[in-house]
Amino acid sequence: MSRLNINTKLVRRMLVGFLQDEIWKVGAKKAVLGLSGGIDSALVCHLAAEALGPENVHAICMPYRTSNPESEAHARLVAEASGVQFSVVGITPMVDAYFDQFPDANNMRRGNKMARERMTVLFDHSALYGGLVLGTSNKTELLLGYGTLYGDMASALNPIGDLYKTQVWQLSEEVGVPKPVIEKKPSADLWAGQTDEEELGFTYREVDELLYRMVDQRADTAELVAAGFKQEFVSSIYSKVQNSHFKRRLPVIAKVSGRTIDRDFRYSRDWGK
């Protein structure tokens, strides 16, 4: 049995309860999420529908003109399967208006801009519906820094941030995510033909095995190499995790007082509750 195997029924109950507790305790009843047509957002959509009722979940597909038409088709498929409220908001006019001033911008800049435009749409709809924005980044992406700061990494709550990609696949089977979404190659769909694993240079299953030992089991480099991982791979992943730490925390605040936010003023739960 793989170390990454999870009790999907138990984790399902935990995450449904998490969404209910965190959303209801602030007086909200609804949730908003971006539905890309990929497996991560599909899983969050199904969990939110189960936790809040599909009528209280607003899923928004936000295509750009180069987006694969299959992505929107799969987003619709997930919305139909989960029964949530679904809408499409194109981001082409907003993105192109900006890059008309910077026509030589590379794919990375354009992809980050798209992610941040989608973030603004989601938080605007959060205000419209009075719901919290749900994050859809998994643990693998968060550890590698494979996401856009204040873009797809921005949310009020993230129910799948402690699930490796391998575990996202497992739980998606449990909750009933449509097969075409589970079986397709992971892609952020930021430019034509882009796939996550080709861009990263390794498969999610390979890196998940390494990350689990490195992070969850705290294995050092010598132990990881002894377990069969190549030294170059271990060093590369360690660097990615280390260099992307700024994406996983609040902005660093210069300390000038007796109690500084995220330094001395830190609480595991809401202050005073």
Swiss-Prot record:
InterPro entries recorded: NAD/GMP_synthase, NAD_synthase, NH(3)-dep_NAD(+)_synth, Rossmann-like_a/b/a_fold
This protein's pathway: Cofactor biosynthesis; NAD(+) biosynthesis; NAD(+) from deamido-NAD(+) (ammonia route): step 1/1
SS bond partners: none
Pfam families (alphabetical): NAD_synthase (PF02540)
Keywords recorded for this protein, A-Z: ATP-binding, Ligase, Magnesium, Metal-binding, NAD, Nucleotide-binding
GO biological process, one term: NAD biosynthetic process
UniProt xrefs under Gene3D superfamilies: HUPs
SUPFAM superfamilies membership: Adenine nucleotide alpha hydrolases-like
Enzyme class: ligase
Residues reported in the UniProt entry to bind Mg(2+): D40, E141
Annotated residues for binding of ATP: G34, L35, S36, G37, G38, I39, D40, S41, T136, K165, S187
GO MF: ATP binding; glutaminase activity; metal ion binding; NAD+ synthase (glutamine-hydrolyzing) activity; NAD+ synthase activity
EC number: 6.3.1.5
Entry annotated with the keyword tRNA-binding: no
Binding site residues for deamido-NAD(+): R116
Cellular component GO terms, alphabetical: cytoplasm
Catalytic activity: deamido-NAD(+) + NH4(+) + ATP = AMP + diphosphate + NAD(+) + H(+)
Subunit structure and binding partners: Homodimer.
Recorded family membership: Belongs to the NAD synthetase family.
Function: Catalyzes the ATP-dependent amidation of deamido-NAD to form NAD. Uses ammonia as a nitrogen source.
Protein name in the entry: NH(3)-dependent NAD(+) synthetase
Organism of this sequence: Trichlorobacter lovleyi (strain ATCC BAA-1151 / DSM 17278 / SZ)
Record gene name: nadE
